[in-house]
Amino acid sequence: HGSRGLGDVYKRQRQADRIGFVDAEPYVYQNAFSGIDPETGRPSYDPNHTPSTGDSVDFCPSLWGGKDWPPAAYNPGTGLVYIPVNENHCGVIEGREVTYMPGSSYTGARTEFTLRDPEGNIGEIQAWDMNRGEEVWSVEFQSHNWGGILTTGGNLIFSGGTSDRFFRAHDAT
């Protein structure tokens, strides 16, 4: 499972009383976390990229980076998970003291979005072999990739959601 905003693909295993953590591998560049607890799968925040009141820090992936909301898809025929990704999307966050005002944002932060590499791509589709825990292939897009993935028994994947408004078909293998 591609985590929504952490930047890691999580491998989990069903157990009698819970869903257990097995492993995690980064699928986008991330600097906000210093590690992952091998027992629980919980990330540890890197203090160099954790905001405090009045201080600004950079962090990757941004609030829009990583997988975010679009759904990934699994194809049992190929054994691959296909993840819609926004790579190269970072941000800056500054902690602020705020006074609660009904109906307004109450985050206690000012955020902005940046590109880690202005010449690089932003959107991608990544195919991951979860048995090996590694990326098998990817397709890059110059714009964000906000579309979900659909995979078929005929070993195709379909996607949309880039700013060029194309609907794409790819070989799932």
Residue ranges of model-derived segments:
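Short coil/turn linkers that define WD40 beta-propeller blade boundaries
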Residues: 13-16, 79, 133
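Short loop/turn segments that connect beta-strands within beta-propeller blades
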Residues: 130-131, 172-173
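Extracytoplasmic beta-rich repeat domains
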Residues: 24-71, 100-110, 115, 119-122, ...
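Single conserved hydrophobic/aromatic residue that forms the stacking wall/gate
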Residues: 1-13
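Terminal amphipathic helices with adjacent charged low-complexity linkers/tails
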Residues: 19-23, 88-89
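Repeat-blade elements of multi-bladed beta-propeller folds
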Residues: 4, 68-74, 78-85, 145-166
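Short, solvent-exposed loop/turn and secondary-structure capping segments
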Residues: 11-12, 84-85, 92-96
